[in-house]
Amino acid sequence: VLFNVHLSAYGADAAIMAAQRATLYEDMKRERAAGNYVVAGGDYNHDMIGVSGDVYGNATDAVESWAKPYDFDGVPEGFTVASKAKLDETGIAGFSDAGTCRDAGRPYDGTNDRWVMDTFIYSDNVEPTFYETVDLDFAYSDHNPVLLKFRLK
C-alpha cells in the first residue's frame, strides 16, 4: 500500500500536526497488520533528519513551525523513516544528500536555507535498496524529488 502524504505546514497548532501523524500511523499499522507492504512518501513538512540546519549550514536561527524536527519517537514500531535511517548510518559528516526543500521566501541563489522535508516511511517487510534526493538544484520547485528503490520481503 502506497500513501502519498503532504502534512500540514503552517500554524503553531501542534495538536493538528499530531492528529495528522496519528491518523497516518493508524492507517499504516492497520495495513501492515493485514499483511500488506506499506510505504508512505511525501512532504512531511518537518525536518526529517532532525539536524538539517547543521547539515546544510542554514543561516536562520529561528525554526519555523514547519521546519521543526520530526517526532521520530512517535513512529510506530516496525516502521522506519528512510532519511533518518540514512543519517544514522552515515552520521552528519557523511550525509551528502541534497536538501529536499529550500527557503522559498526569496529567489533561489544557492544560499537559501535547506531542509530534508520529503522522505518515505516504510514497514519492516519492505527492504530499501537505494535512497537519495535527486539534486535538481530546485530548478522546478522549492522541493527536490526523493527516490526510494525497494524490494518486498
Annotate the PLM regions.
Residues V1-K153:
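Active-site regions of metal-assisted phosphoester/phosphodiester hydrolases
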